[in-house]
């Protein structure tokens, strides 16, 4: 079905196509025809962060920023869906155009800039969702006009609002599209922010009588020293998990493309090697008690297996769906299933 719809979607501006695709998925869900888009995979229960995921393949943050399509997306067969990034207050994001397809590379460049309706709107949407068939992650960020010195208050506010509703919460400090945000990954800034949020997490756990895991999403543009520092902080503060990685600001594999000079984060196939390398290095530096989600460049079941081989417990897709459609979900689940059933038992590949 997606192969028939793709030419129409690709004839539209990327952001308009994004909106149309979501409306189509919603329509299929409401009319009971989701099976025409995607066959729900046989369950492959996977433990991580003290949770049991129906399968290890999730949707990365950014597709459903406001939590308006949760049930329709879960119906495609994802084991979990991550919504957001959401900020305390609504914001428009960056000026359009701000999303670009690079079909020759199966890639996307975006500079959306955390456009969202604000955390209160997201909370209302989540409360209306039925949430059958998978788990829900909520990705939180800061408003663009909040200085980094005050960022903790934005993250704390979002965490307090979504905590009762989320299965896990992701702290996004790695988007390249909010000025200065990635500075929060620097060791001292990271330690201050995550320490404060860990205290908030523990207080909220006591208040609500449940512990919601807190994950941190990192950039792919980290050198070895950056990775060492981040791993040291995240291990010291005992975060529940790490998502590796966000989009990249580098362009070595698409340097000759006319859109290479566009500002924003590059995702899709060209990100696979770089993001998987960061994933593997983090796995080597973090204790096994901190599971990793591998995301970046997954366009096939083999790509998902590469993430698992590098040390991921779970994976997420996003840009790959633009080029492959919802069938990518089941393909990834089945590829991971075959790997898990292989005689090697899914060992982590060495550095």
From Swiss-Prot:
Substrate binds at residues 65, 110-114, 172, 177, 246-247. It catalyses: (S)-dihydroorotate + a quinone = orotate + a quinol. Pfam families: DHO_dh. Its main location: membrane. The keyword Nucleotide-binding does not apply. One of its GO terms (cellular component) is cytoplasm. GO terms for molecular function: dihydroorotate dehydrogenase (quinone) activity. Keywords: Cell membrane, Flavoprotein, FMN, Membrane, Oxidoreductase, Pyrimidine biosynthesis. Binds 1 FMN per subunit. Its cofactor is FMN. It is found in: Cell membrane. PANTHER family: DIHYDROOROTATE DEHYDROGENASE (QUINONE), MITOCHONDRIAL (PTHR48109:SF4), DIHYDROOROTATE DEHYDROGENASE (QUINONE), MITOCHONDRIAL-RELATED (PTHR48109). Monomer. Belongs to the dihydroorotate dehydrogenase family. Type 2 subfamily. This is Dihydroorotate dehydrogenase (quinone). The lineage of its organism: Bacteria, Pseudomonadati, Pseudomonadota, Gammaproteobacteria, Lysobacterales.
């Amino acid at each position: 079905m997606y192969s028939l719809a793709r030419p129409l979607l690709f004839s539209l501006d990327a952001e308009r196509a994004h909106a149309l695709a979501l409306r189509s998925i919603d329509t299929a869900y409401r009319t009971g025809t989701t099976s025409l888009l995607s066959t729900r995979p046989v369950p492959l229960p996977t433990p991580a962060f003290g949770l049991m995921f129906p399968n290890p393949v999730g949707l990365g943050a950014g597709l459903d920023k406001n939590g308006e399509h949760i049930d329709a997306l879960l119906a495609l067969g994802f084991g979990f869906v991550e919504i957001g990034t959401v900020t305390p207050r609504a914001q428009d994001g960056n000026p359009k155009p701000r999303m670009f397809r690079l079909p020759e590379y199966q890639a996307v460049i975006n500079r959306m800039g955390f456009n969202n309706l604000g955390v209160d709107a997201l909370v209302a949407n989540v409360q209306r969702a039925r949430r059958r068939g998978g788990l829900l992650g909520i990705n939180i960020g800061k408003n663009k006009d909040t200085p980094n010195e005050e960022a903790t208050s934005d993250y704390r506010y979002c965490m307090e609002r979504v905590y009762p509703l989320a299965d896990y919460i992701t702290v996004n400090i790695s988007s390249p599209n909010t000025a200065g945000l990635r500075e929060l990954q620097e060791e001292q800034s990271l330690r201050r922010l995550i320490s404060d949020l860990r205290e908030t997490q523990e207080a909220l756990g006591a208040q609500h009588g449940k512990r919601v895991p807190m994950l941190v999403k990192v950039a792919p543009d980290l050198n070895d020293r950056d990775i060492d520092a981040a791993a040291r902080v995240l291990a010291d503060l005992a975060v529940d998990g790490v998502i590796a990685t966000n989009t990249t600001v580098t362009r070595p594999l698409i340097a000759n493309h006319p859109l290479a000079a566009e500002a924003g984060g590059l995702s899709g196939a060209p990100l696979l090697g770089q993001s998987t390398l960061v994933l593997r290095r983090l796995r080597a530096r973090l204790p096994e008690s901190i599971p990793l989600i591998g995301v970046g460049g997954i366009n096939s079941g083999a790509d998902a297996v590469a993430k698992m081989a590098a040390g991921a417990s779970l994976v997420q897709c996003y840009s790959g769906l633009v080029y492959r459609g919802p069938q990518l979900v089941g393909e990834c689940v089945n590829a991971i299933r075959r790997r898990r059933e292989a005689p090697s038992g899914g060992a982590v590949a060495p550095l």
